[in-house]
């Protein structure tokens, strides 16, 4: 039986930041020099994606958003992730564990995170969601979006 190299003995862990809030979380982890993890940023907003420190970036929903973001609409974020599900699956292939981080309440994070979680789990990865909720001052619409999206995500993660 051949011996495995050191890199083969560790779980392949990926952290995927979805939308603005998720990308901010990934940036903080990278700046804190978290090791042993691959970072990916996913966004519908081309400008925001350029600001990400993540070495792997996936722009989703170009046909729907033309790179201009989801405009706070989770249904656009969902459709964007569905449109580019193959790009997402390619980035997550062979992952042992996937952490999905997103801010709930906006468009891309709220809508795309459940789709990405479903892709990761269907590929056999242990799938964990880590999300933030909006502040009270952000309003009822964002709070309702966050509640609905968090419930959808809860059903797609382990």
Residue ranges and their predicted role:
Residues 1-158:
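Tubulin/FtsZ superfamily GTPase core signature
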